[in-house]
Structures are given as C-alpha cells and as structure tokens.
Amino acid sequence: MTKVYFVCHAQPEHDWEEDRTRPLTEEGKKDSEIVLEFLKDKKIDAFYCSPYKRSMDTIAEAAAFFTKEIITDERLREREKGSDGNNHGMFQKRWADHDYHEDGGESIVMVQNRNIEALNEILSDNTDKEIVIGTHGTALSTILNFYDNSFGCEEFLRIIDWMPYIIELDFAGDKLVGKQEHCHVQKEFKGKQRADKK
C-alpha cells in the first residue's frame, strides 16, 4: 500500500499579487510547525510539491528533517485564476459546472486532469512507500472529487478554511483504498464570504 499525505499550505499573504511567489504570513509560518509535528514519526520516502512558494514553504521544515529534496511538479500547481475568480459566486459556478471557467482562468476539469496525471506518475514511481505532496485548496479538492464525486462546493468551502490541512489517501496501485483527515489549523479564506454576509 502506498500512503500519500497531502499537505495543503498554511496561511498565505492574500494581498500579494503574484500567485507563484506568494509567501506565508508570519502566522502561517508558525502554523506550518504542525506539519513536521505530525510527520516526524512517519517513514517518509519522498516529498513532492507544487512549485508555488507557499506550498513549498509549508513542507520545507519537514523535508529538511527527513533530509529529502522537494521535487516540484508544475502540474500540481493551484488553479490559474482569471479576473474576479475567487469569490463565493464563482466557487458555486465552477463546482456546479466543472467545465466552467472565467476569462483567463482554469476550470475544475482542467485542474483535475493535470493533478491526477501527476499523482498517477507519483504513485507509479513510489509503490508501497510513504510520500508527502504539498498542495493547494482547489488542486486538492479536484483530486478528492476525482475519487469521490460527491465531493463538491460545500466540501471545498469547508477545507479552504484549513491552512495547513493534512489528509492521507491510501492506494493499492492507482486504486484508492483508504482516506483519513489528520489535522488542520482553522483560518478563514479571504473571498469566501457570500455577497449577503455582513
């Protein structure tokens, strides 16, 4: 059995314009300590990650503890967002129609296809090992939806408030055989609020 620990990044600087280089807040850096605390008694064979700074920084301390390099994969990056793509109305539209995307943005299907392609390669290369994948809220949600199509907008809205968040998926080959949520830190995602919320 292959164990994959998906680690969704800690709290980032939401006002930072450039998505790829967006850093963690000071609070987010401190919250990242739970990642090492959780992983340190595991036998981690490899660390994979989105190339985005916030995801890499969330797992960096744990990778150093295990003296492992972080292997980045462009396909694991977060959803490309277009104009006004991160608000409650747009979340609902995208999860109601997985092919929908705003101008300049990616659909759920587009994000899912590249993340699952990367995951399948990682699973093929790491049979019966324990690995960590540094990820993002939407990217991870598309993976969870791939294996359980009941995972939708409400489930997505639940986990994007968790930064960081660790969930374990267990695989026999490329078949999912187990799932367990382990730990998270509650942080409200900016832009999540409904338009009618004061």
Where are these regions (language model features)?
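Active-site-proximal alpha-helix that buttresses catalytic centers in soluble enzyme cores
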Residues: 2-70, 104-109, 163
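Generic beta-sheet signal
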Residues: 4, 129-138
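Short active-site segment of divalent metal-dependent hydrolases/proteases
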Residues: 12, 139-140
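Phosphate-handling substructures
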Residues: 22, 64-117
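Glycine-rich phosphate-binding loop signature in dinucleotide/nucleotide-binding domains
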Residues: 41-43, 122-129
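Short beta-strand scaffold positions
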Residues: 49-50, 113, 134-135
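Domain-level recognition of soluble alpha/beta enzyme cores
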Residues: 148-178
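Acidic, His/Gly-rich catalytic cores of divalent-metal-dependent hydrolytic chemistry
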Residues: 179-198
